[in-house]
């Protein structure tokens, strides 16, 4: 199925997921650190839920990447 989100947004989500996996962080662990259920992370990564800017910054920090570096790539 084709995503309803732009290529740029998909790149952002891909970078977040890759950083999470590279850091050996599970969806469960990331969700808990964010105060959300694992399903929240799964929905974000699968394109079922869109992040707002505050959630994006929090996720970047939790997976150890600089939000500005991701934005500069878009």
Each predicted region: which residue ranges?
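Phosphate-coordinating loops and pocket residues in cytosolic domains that bind phosphorylated ligands
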Residues: 72-73
